[in-house]
Amino acid sequence: MVTVGNYCEAEGPVGPAWMQDGLSPCFFFTLVPSTRMALGTLALVLALPCRRRERPAGADSLSWGAGPRISPYVLQLLLATLQAALPLAGLAGRVGTARGAPLPSYLLLASVLESLAGACGLWLLVVERSQARQRLAMGIWIKFRHSPGLLLLWTVAFAAENLALVSWNSPQWWWARADLGQQVQFSLWVLRYVVSGGLFVLGLWAPGLRPQSYTLQVHEEDQDVERSQVRSAAQQSTWRDFGRKLRLLSGYLWPRGSPALQLVVLICLGLMGLERALNVLVPIFYRNIVNLLTEKAPWNSLAWTVTSYVFLKFLQGGGTGSTGFVSNLRTFLWIRVQQFTSRRVELLIFSHLHELSLRWHLGRRTGEVLRIADRGTSSVTGLLSYLVFNVIPTLADIIIGIIYFSMFFNAWFGLIVFLCMSLYLTLTIVVTEWRTKFRRAMNTQENATRARAVDSLLNFETVKYYNAESYEVERYREAIIKYQGLEWKSSASLVLLNQTQNLVIGLGLLAGSLLCAYFVTEQKLQVGDYVLFGTYIIQLYMPLNWFGTYYRMIQTNFIDMENMFDLLKEETEVKDLPGAGPLRFQKGRIEFENVHFSYADGRETLQDVSFTVMPGQTLALVGPSGAGKSTILRLLFRFYDISSGCIRIDGQDISQVTQASLRSHIGVVPQDTVLFNDTIADNIRYGRVTAGNDEVEAAAQAAGIHDAIMAFPEGYRTQVGERGLKLSGGEKQRVAIARTILKAPGIILLDEATSALDTSNERAIQASLAKVCANRTTIVVAHRLSTVVNADQILVIKDGCIVERGRHEALLSRGGVYADMWQLQQGQEETSEDTKPQTMER
């Protein structure tokens, strides 16, 4: 019968870590299994939200072999199963070869922890395979990798088996194979080495997550691909593709193109390393002071130690490095780096938005796009700050603390710190993930409550009409009560989190303090060591109090960053072809040849449109609304690319030249002129931003608006207001004409430029437009036919086709569509003239 003896082979503590030319087996098989178990638990915690959110209906419709590769995955599954079973086999081997000798307790603990860690790895492998099959079933495929947690778990296992080789010459290990027990343990080590090495290599390859060589066919009756993709995108875990997100983020950490800021980054990282050293040195000097006071050391030694301690404390700050000189210096230096990163991201997004097509902008709400851009910029700088200067330093402090206590105190202290910190982080992440749903529900209800109040106040008159004040107050009260109920859950869960953290801190401090006090009474440690332990532990725990906040903020920032990167992934619809050259403008001959075009709905807006505008001529486009007249102008300006056919200017296909050169030769006067919230002078100067004040005034005089501008108290420096609301419709049109005059293009496009004006303003604007269009190729989209009677050619567009073409007189003589439109408009104008006196008489 096998009995269980002391924790280690020899009576005493786990340490020292190194003895008899090798690592202590007791120390090694306590630290490694505990580390692997903590990593496995943490990986499971991070995987659970992902598992919970990614379980859509119909995700299991694939057969076992229809997903990613199965043959290498079976091998990976077998190795993971062996990794979970081998520790128990090793324990059985120990029991079978013990020959009545007591079995050290650490072997039992190591076997259980190693098996549980292996089981965590096995479960994660199965879950990730299942998630890969789900995404494939939903028609989504990206570059798959195992999660960082699983890879780290397998890496640590393989590294631990290699670490055992440093004890090759130690008689405590099984390398000599002197008896049956050592031979069995050596054989099991070889098997573990092969298994862990195989899992490490296969983990990097991830065969169970890679696609088959054939193409998967998804039956339409079984899968709604479009809805599945939307659902998956909305429900996927924040931590999915964590490594890819970190790589994207790391690109903004290093300020490319600025050697000075790169040096600042290196200095900041060096200061961060100095803070880690200070967090170790401050408790050590505090311990030395206590020991010197206990030993009644000379005043000189005590004064020097106290002075050094206070100086280090000044550098460190209030115990956590958050307000010390080093931290403040790092924060000060980082301001420029943060501004550089923010500026770079903002300009990247803004430039990309201007490269996207008109089709994309018409389908998006500008406020939503700008909100994504703002949040994305803040998320990049916030993530860099949280990860680089909060999370990573905190984890580094924990690792340094574990190593320090294991080496200079006892391995038990390192184990206590490790277990407490692991439990602390795990519980923080679990509870934070759990309470996220309360926070989300509270935010949703807060928006609903605010919307209820806004809606009631906006409809103030309606509330008064129906004497519904008490009803509205009651509805608002119910919304507040519902919000406060959710707020209570969120606040209560935060209290639970804080109390859980406090409990873990207390248990860890109690265990370590009792052990430290015991060693002090045994005269293995000094009184100062007890003080050092308590100071160091509290110092480690203080930044961890904010770890839940960091975790939640990192989640939020990752979501915002994903939205920003999704925005940056939007393809530019209209692109310059590789090698495209500038437009060689000559006289302005425009040709449309068999042009077909359709918007996103698939319905053809233009069908086989062909026409030619000779240099200096005016072409008018008329027809009912929605016929495709404005679309022709947008195609010529290349807001869209045509489906088929060809558009040429001076014999050059406009799709073969750069967009900038094309648009530099075209001036547009739209129906609704939108002005920038700037001065009148700057709005006119927008036609050519390098123009001087004299040129701006000359353009305004040519457009007939100079006198109106000078009538304003501030003249050309008058602010036009948002979207030019301080100016009348006629004044805004004249500003647009002045812009076009200043641009001096070779081609003019008039998109119903006077249709929104009254008759007197229209006639005045027409006179200004005639000056602008003189000797320039002009295309006019007209609603009032009387404005285009002098056009060199008139095209009648109906349902995307040219149904008639010719001059005004010729079209009237045909008695077709144009003649009917003319008669209808003439009748409407006569009716309008007849009713004016009657209206005046009333």
Swiss-Prot record:
Its record classes its membrane topology as: Multi-pass membrane protein
Q: Tell me the organism.
A: Homo sapiens (Human)
Does the record's keyword annotation contain Transcription?
no
Give me the reactions it catalyses. Answer: heme b(in) + ATP + H2O = heme b(out) + ADP + phosphate + H(+); coproporphyrin III(in) + ATP + H2O = coproporphyrin III(out) + ADP + phosphate + H(+); pheophorbide a(in) + ATP + H2O = pheophorbide a(out) + ADP + phosphate + H(+); coproporphyrinogen III(in) + ATP + H2O = coproporphyrinogen III(out) + ADP + phosphate + H(+)
In the UniProt record, the gene name given for this protein reads: ABCB6
- Which class of enzymes does this protein belong to? translocase
Looking at the UniProt entry, the stretches that span the membrane are 27-47, 73-93, 107-127, 148-168, 186-206, 264-284, 292-312, 376-396, 398-418, 500-520, 530-550
Q: Which Pfam families match?
A: ABC_membrane (PF00664), ABC_tran (PF00005), MTABC_N (PF16185)
Cellular component GO terms, alphabetical: ATP-binding cassette (ABC) transporter complex; cytosol; early endosome membrane; endolysosome membrane; endoplasmic reticulum; endoplasmic reticulum membrane; endosome; extracellular exosome
Q: What is the effect of changing T521S?
A: May be a modifier of disease severity in porphyria patients; loss of expression
Q: What upregulates this protein?
A: Up-regulated by cellular porphyrins (at protein level). Up-regulated during erythroid differentiation (at protein level). Induced by sodium arsenite in a dose-dependent manner.
Give the residue ranges for region: Required for ATPase activity: 1-236
- How is this chain's activity regulated? ATPase activity is inhibited by MgATP with an IC(50) of 1.03 mM and up-regulated by coporphyrin III> hemin > protoporphyrin IX. ATPase activity for hemin is up-regulated by glutathione. The ATPase activity is impaired by increasing copper concentrations (0-300 uM). The ATPase activity is stimulated in presence of glutathione for increasing copper concentrations (0-300 uM).
Entry note about domains:
Contains two independently folding units, the N-terminal transmembrane domain (residues 1-205) and the ABC-core domain (206-842) are respectively responsible for the lysosomal targeting and the ATPase activity.
Q: Which residues lie on this side of the membrane: Lumenal?
A: 1-26, 94-106, 169-185, 285-291, 397, 521-529
What name does the UniProt record give this protein? Answer: ATP-binding cassette sub-family B member 6
So what does mutating C8S actually do? Does not affect substrate binding. Does not affect N-glycosylation. Impairs endoplasmic reticulum exit. Impairs endoplasmic reticulum exit. Increases ABCB6 proteasomal degradation. Affects protein stability
| One record GO biological process | brain development
- Which SUPFAM superfamilies is this protein grouped with? ABC transporter transmembrane region (SSF90123), P-loop containing nucleoside triphosphate hydrolases (SSF52540)
Q: Can you give the residue ranges of the ABC transmembrane type-1 domain?
A: 265-556
Q: Which PROSITE patterns match?
A: ABC_TM1F, ABC_TRANSPORTER_1, ABC_TRANSPORTER_2
